[in-house]
Amino acid sequence: MAKEYSRTQRIGDQMQRELAQLIRREIKDPRVGLVTITAVDVSRDVGHAKIFMTVMGQDSAEEIAQTIKVLNSAAGFLRMQLAREMKLRSVPQLHFHYDESVVRGAHLSALIERAVAEDGQHQEGPASADAKPESTEE
């Protein structure tokens, strides 16, 4: 029977929970906004972890890049704090990356909504012109 949930996935999930709390509690830099950890991808040898995150309220590329720079510079501190919280022989090196899937998903959702609205307008136009007026005679 194959394992459905690998060790690296379990480590990644625990790291996601712990990092979310640590960043909120320990990182006091004003350049870091409301960070949401969306995923953690741990390498098979548990030597490296890619942390995918989004930042609420920061839409410009400069602000996002600044937040990632701050988090990557605090990666050693966060790794040390993770070592205290997690029971691992060695804690992976942390590499923060911006998760563009949320922005891409919102953009695709807006495109779909616009297409549905335009399709609805096209459907209403010819249908109302072809409709026969109802008679009120009884």
Swiss-Prot record:
The gene is rbfA. GO terms for biological process: maturation of SSU-rRNA. Its main location: cytoplasm. InterPro entries: KH_dom-like_a/b, RbfA, RbfA_dom_sf, Ribosome-bd_factorA_CS. PANTHER family: RIBOSOME-BINDING FACTOR A, CHLOROPLASTIC-RELATED (PTHR33515:SF1). Monomer. Binds 30S ribosomal subunits, but not 50S ribosomal subunits or 70S ribosomes. One of its GO terms (molecular function) is ribosomal small subunit binding. It comes from Pseudomonas syringae pv. syringae (strain B728a). One of several proteins that assist in the late maturation steps of the functional core of the 30S ribosomal subunit. Associates with free 30S ribosomal subunits (but not with 30S subunits that are part of 70S ribosomes or polysomes). Required for efficient processing of 16S rRNA. May interact with the 5'-terminal helix region of 16S rRNA. One of its GO terms (cellular component) is cytosol. This is Ribosome-binding factor A. Keywords: Cytoplasm, Ribosome biogenesis. Disulfide bonds: none annotated. Residues 117-138 are annotated as: Disordered. It is found in: Cytoplasm. Belongs to the RbfA family.
